[in-house]
Amino acid sequence: MAVQRAASPRRPPAPLWPRLLLPLLLLLLPAPSEGLGHSAELAFAVEPSDDVAVPGQPIVLDCRVEGTPPVRITWRKNGVELPESTHSTLLANGSLMIRHFRLEPGGSPSDEGDYECVAQNRFGLVVSRKARIQAATMSDFHVHPQATVGEEGGVARFQCQIHGLPKPLITWEKNRVPIDTDNERYTLLPKGVLQITGLRAEDGGIFHCVASNIASIRISHGARLTVSGSGSGAYKEPAILVGPENLTLTVHQTAVLECVATGNPRPIVSWSRLDGRPIGVEGIQVLGTGNLIISDVTVQHSGVYVCAANRPGTRVRRTAQGRLVVQAPAEFVQHPQSISRPAGTTAMFTCQAQGEPPPHVTWLKNGQVLGPGGHVRLKNNNSTLTISGIGPEDEAIYQCVAENSAGSSQASARLTVLWAEGLPGPPRNVRAVSVSSTEVRVSWSEPLANTKEIIGYVLHIRKAADPPELEYQEAVSKSTFQHLVSDLEPSTAYSFYIKAYTPRGASSASVPTLASTLGEAPAPPPLSVRVLGSSSLQLLWEPWPRLAQHEGGFKLFYRPASKTSFTGPILLPGTVSSYNLSQLDPTAVYEVKLLAYNQHGDGNATVRFVSLRGASERTALSPPCDCRKEEAANQTSTTGIVIGIHIGVTCIIFCVLFLLFGQRGRVLLCKDVENQLSPPQGPRSQRDPGILALNGARRGQRGQLGRDEKRVDMKELEQLFPPASAAGQPDPRPTQDPAAPAPCEETQLSVLPLQGCGLMEGKTTEAKTTEATAPCAGLAAAPPPPDGGPGLLSEGQASRPAAARVTQPAHSEQ
């Protein structure tokens, strides 16, 4: 739907000199320094890491800090500072020792949790990454090995599953004796799987799974392996008994993708990636008869792996697949850098981290989470921290913490605020008063002290509902204590505060003040009208959802142009963008009005006229186009198709010859019509007063007419849109020779312009000649209108209807 977007009334541009003065004020400030003794920055040399502790045993959490002494080190557990006690001891190097690790069920004190090392000196405070400390445990087996029967020469598989911290080491016993791991027919997988290939009678026995870690040792139930007689002579289709599982690992771990295949003859097992990329050879090995082992996995190893079992010498194959996801803990691509800035200026820190999944970035100020608000802004997924109008309270150590499901990392930087002596205080008595719907006047008093060196003021402006990063500034002369802020939005609350600037720096900010602009009625909405049928119209416009916020919407009126009163108002919400009118008089010309309203009243209306005679789908007052060319093209195309289907090739040739002999007469006639339309040489004539009568009063006279009482000159409408009843009346115009070629048809027009304009006015001689020949020649062949209206124009009648052919008149306001 090609409807133009509603444009708010144009505001006068804001004065240029405040924008030019602001950079001049900033140039007079002292140049910033990029660092003050970075060698003395407070930072961690060693941070605590995740660990598993044995209940009742001691554990040490490492932490070493570098920085300007004295440095105070404390520890937090789950975000709460640990008090000094005999249960835990702070070592001289900053590490924490827990003497007897506790794991008490049922809500009793436990030492499990997330630990952080906190270091502080006179410049600020930093917090280490979180280290998760868990107790070593061992559960019972939740999957025991099952009894298995295998054929001699075949494959047997046992599996057990158990949870524990740290991850248990799985070994196997046969008849209570550890199996021989040097036997190449026995394959032990780390996830608790035992595979035996090439089964023999001596492989039979009872197998146990043994799990062990620092917490405990567990032995599973026994499972018997029975080896039956050889069935090697029988053919068996290849089959995959066990395929690869979906795995999620962290970088540098080992991936084990299992694939156990059977068949006779023994199938060949191969591996590939579903995406077609090569698996590679570095760190890759095949364990047993088909298990894929990837050592030291990286993010690039992520993907879907396909195990295929092929019968030798044939294309018979079976496949199974599993997905490997490799995660990478967060690490920094760009660390924040320590900076120093003059008071009143802007400080910016940048911190970029990468990982898989992408890490989330959080900022800390002296160990406390820092969120956006006030003069603090976070952009680019929190990777950029901006602090505007810095003051002494902003001097601190800022940390960037990047964290994902695979791990976390932190980096810190220090902000030093250069505060010169003799800076002025904040401006006083700041007031903001609404002047109009787009202007607010802000006034203030100069600071109490140190005013002699003031070189200007900077006014900070933003919508009260907007985030701080959308704030903008305007500079004001030092001798001015008020400023008119223009180009604002109606019915909108704004926040204002001011700073005084000297060559040494800026003052602190004044107390913010709020003011709302006055409201106004909305602008006229753009309106398009489409003829859907002989008695229906479709009205199209752009929705304005904001009207609903101001108790507003749209009002729709319509009437036959011959009537005095309108039907309406039809009230529509601001979110609606179309409306259909039906059961209309197919012989009438309709006037349609659409206006927007809010709590401040009704806006100006957009008016459209449209005729339903000879109804076909048309667009009223559509964007500029050469309608005569379009109609001629459509008629030529349609005629060609109908003739080609119903008459045949012979009739096509006949019609072409007929058109060739008739074209010359039509061109000559249209040239005569165009000469009648062309204005005389010399000064341009005034617009036809009859056309102006159709459009109502001029701009200066609009206020004298009632909005709903204005009527259209019906004599003019009858000439432009003759009623259907006129078909039976004698035509007072000169008769047209039936043998003469038909000029442009009057009833082809369905659009009435709202402002006077001449068809040929302002056109070059070449353009006139072009429009007077080919387009008109095409229209001359148009059939008479079905409603019985006049179908032909004489040369003397072409002047006024031709002026009504313009399809893009200038918009008028009701």
From Swiss-Prot:
Instruction: Identify one Gene Ontology CC term for this UniProt entry.
Output: membrane
GO biological process terms, alphabetically, are: cell-cell adhesion; neuromuscular process controlling balance
Keyword Transmembrane included in the entry's annotation = yes
Q: Per the UniProt annotation, where are the glycans attached?
A: 93, 246, 381-382, 580, 604, 634
Protein topology in the membrane: Single-pass membrane protein
Record's keyword terms, sorted: Disulfide bond, Glycoprotein, Immunoglobulin domain, Membrane, Repeat, Signal, Transmembrane, Transmembrane helix
Pfam families associated with the record: fn3, I-set, Ig_3
All residue ranges annotated as the Fibronectin type-III domain in the record? 426-520, 523-618
- The record lists the membrane-crossing segments as 641-661
Disulfide partners: 63-117, 160-209, 259-307, 351-400
Where is the protein found, in the record's own terms?
A: Membrane
Give the start-end ranges of region Disordered: 722-743, 762-814
Annotated SMART domains? FN3 (SM00060), IG (SM00409), IGc2 (SM00408)
- PROSITE patterns in alphabetical order: FN3, IG_LIKE
The chain positions of domain Ig-like C2-type read 36-139, 140-220, 238-321, 329-416
Its predominant location is: membrane
What family classification does the UniProt entry report for this protein?
Belongs to the immunoglobulin superfamily. DCC family.
Q: Which PANTHER family match?
A: IMMUNOGLOBULIN SUPERFAMILY DCC SUBCLASS MEMBER 3, PROTEIN SIDEKICK
Record's protein name? Immunoglobulin superfamily DCC subclass member 3
Q: Which organism is it from?
A: Homo sapiens
